[in-house]
């Protein structure tokens, strides 16, 4: 299989984003999916690039969502995967270090 440089570069970028330091947290949030009512979720780990959460409500892969983070507010994300009640999302924008530091009280 031949990989073009552009494709390879995008894959390297994706791996770099996934490799961001993840922190275990106990963080109750609200999630909004377009066309659905708000629903609760518990974020189990978070990084400046994304999160893994549990929620009883179905969220489709690649759905755009809003996540309300305490001390930060509503943040845009894209759901990348779901497995049972677990979901994984990527923030639309890299979370700034100052904002990430606001979540420290929730670190486990």
Q: Over which residues does each language-model region extend?
A:
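Structured alpha-helical
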Residues: 1-108
